[in-house]
Amino acid sequence: DDSILIVCSEVAPILEYITGIKIPLPYVNKSWTILDQTPWKDITRITAGKMYINGSPMVDIDSIHNWITSPIHTNINEAYEDFRHIWNSVTKTMTPACQAGLTYSGGLDSSIILSHIDDLELYTINNIGKDPIIDCIEDFLTNTEKTKLNVFSINEIEWATEYNQMLSRIYMPASSWSFVGQWIVNKNCKQRVLFTGVGADELFGGYDLYKDLKFNTSGSVSPYSQFGPTELWNKCLSSYNGHAGQATMLMDYWHQVTGVDARGIDLIAGAWGIEPRNPFLAKPIMQLALNLPFEFKVNTVSKPLIRRAFLERWDKSLILPKKGFTGHANDSLPYMNCKFDSTGDRMEDWKIIAQKSFYDCKHN
């Protein structure tokens, strides 16, 4: 019935009511993930912070751009004290009465969640041969925490199996190869609540490349958002009064967090009946991060405020390079349900994998 409007947090249930017809979408970097149109005919995304009337966005309620004001911190020590106070409050408020889990990598972000929330079950993915930090993961943990550590070691064949299983359940392309790690964690999580550290890199300056980018007001120069819509770039630039560095990080937030990671975590956790929680995406933390001076985010070290919080418990020697949920995306190609000749470029190959595997997938 054309008069019926279905609103749902994922695609799969909608396809129980309509005939699913896949339509082609442009795979240019990750920009397609913030388009209103989904890869399914007549299924569109709604925009957060807007009131919809008769299926169309009519009234602005709130926006992340409204949270940006002039920086209030003039020195980094003052900024850190505010961060520490807000972080303590947010993590305390977010701690559930029931048992909870944490996606733990040994990195700065998940570590400062671990240090502020007690009795978490820990879930770690070891993409064999990809993540050297996993080999010393127990160095980060107390004896009690070690008893709560669950490590899932995944090879190329297993990665491909999990990828295909995930794709046939979520009914959407995998916007990032990190989705498979999240899928495995949620699949094995025995708690009703699972914490993650998504968003910290984009909000607090976690990408090393930020230190070397030649920021330009003409558009984002970040590889994560350089193909983003001009209208969105202009809005980000305006929100920061023409500061190209701040605008670029906000563009990355829109693409990487709103478009990919946060949406993927919500979708995958929901598939397993789990509630994801993330202190970094709590409004008080986001407001602080969005209004930090640029040099308090992009400095001689990455994420200086989060790094400082990490060093309150752990030694500097444990700040190690990591690749997170890198996965075996390209290495698993021989075992996946899509065949093509490699381009020789891993990122280009991944785009083809993500697109072809979705359009070729026979959803169950």
Where do the protein language model's features map onto the residues?
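Active-site nucleotide-sugar/metal-binding loop of Leloir-type enzymes
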Residues: 187-190, 197
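Adenosyl-5′-phosphate
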Residues: 42-43, 178, 195, 219-364
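ATP-dependent adenylate-handling ligase core
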Residues: 128-184, 204-219, 242-243, 291-298
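Short acidic/histidine-rich active-site segments
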Residues: 194-207
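Short, hydrophobic alpha-helix immediately C-terminal to the catalytic nucleophile
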Residues: 111-115, 183-187, 287
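Cysteine-centered catalytic environments shared across enzyme families
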Residues: 1-165, 169, 192, 308, ...
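Short acidic-aromatic active-site loops that bind/stabilize oxyanions
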Residues: 73-84, 171-175, 247, 251, ...
